């Protein structure tokens, strides 16, 4: 009888690390694997992962980048504690392979996995690698990246995205059947993007009513009241939502998406095959959102506007200058740069590297 293989996923902090990890976890679990997740009790993974019936191990570690003198002074002690906790988790789980998907907790756990001789596979979601993955890449058995040439000796797999996005109809099949005003989807994420919430309503108001697009604007629960007030003040009609349950349908219905440029957003836009105007978050570490967006914008597959250059007048002129055939071509180019088999490929590498 074949022994059941065990995957230990290390990921935490943000959805950009957790959601692709969940995609791979589900893929391997469907193949009969046992999956255990290592995270931080204070991260979103602590509440999200158990909803997927995945057991968790926890370590306590706040990161390698100093947040003040006290944090820097305590870093050696915090690292030592995290190494010890990681050692305990690895001995309890006895994984066949360890998959690091990013976040601070991957550093101590990944180092201990390597020290114990457990196969270590890394996946970097951003176009500029995080500090933990830069260090771990030197000891990992395999390094996978969402964007080309992010880390040395890595394989470009793309980002694992929601299964339904990878199997959407081709852009031509969607754009060619539409008539009337453009459909614009504005995505601010779970926290909302204040810059988009302020500028987009004003920009739409500057357009003649006959040229105004149909707008769906998602802003996060904390920003939704302010957003609705902004549209009311601008006397613009829009569907405003705190969150969107079915992102695949939202992408499928859109001619243009206006959004930030987090790694998963860029990957989802490409997988869906939809035109996008990216406004990178200006305070992202190493300005990685700009580099993420450039992966598509430099190929003519998206538009890129820096937040400091985002004005209502400029955005209004940009929207007025767009038409559906132009957007269809951008969507087609974006789809051509997607890696729809990313989940399958990452799972395949884990299977190849597994050792009982």
Curated annotation (Swiss-Prot):
MF terms in GO: UDP-N-acetyl-D-glucosamine:N-acetylmuramoyl-L-alanyl-D-glutamyl-meso-2,6-diaminopimelyl-D-alanyl-D-alanine-diphosphoundecaprenol 4-beta-N-acetylglucosaminlytransferase activity; undecaprenyldiphospho-muramoylpentapeptide beta-N-acetylglucosaminyltransferase activity
Top-level EC class as recorded in UniProt = transferase
Supply the name of the protein.
Answer: UDP-N-acetylglucosamine--N-acetylmuramyl-(pentapeptide) pyrophosphoryl-undecaprenol N-acetylglucosamine transferase
Task: Write the gene name.
Answer: murG
Which Pfam families does the record associate with it? Glyco_tran_28_C, Glyco_transf_28
Species assigned in the record: Cupriavidus pinatubonensis (strain JMP 134 / LMG 1197) (Cupriavidus necator (strain JMP 134))
Report the NCBIfam families cross-referenced here: murG
Keyword Transferase found: yes
Q: Report which reactions are catalysed by this protein.
A: di-trans,octa-cis-undecaprenyl diphospho-N-acetyl-alpha-D-muramoyl-L-alanyl-D-glutamyl-meso-2,6-diaminopimeloyl-D-alanyl-D-alanine + UDP-N-acetyl-alpha-D-glucosamine = di-trans,octa-cis-undecaprenyl diphospho-[N-acetyl-alpha-D-glucosaminyl-(1->4)]-N-acetyl-alpha-D-muramoyl-L-alanyl-D-glutamyl-meso-2,6-diaminopimeloyl-D-alanyl-D-alanine + UDP + H(+)
| Signal peptide location | none
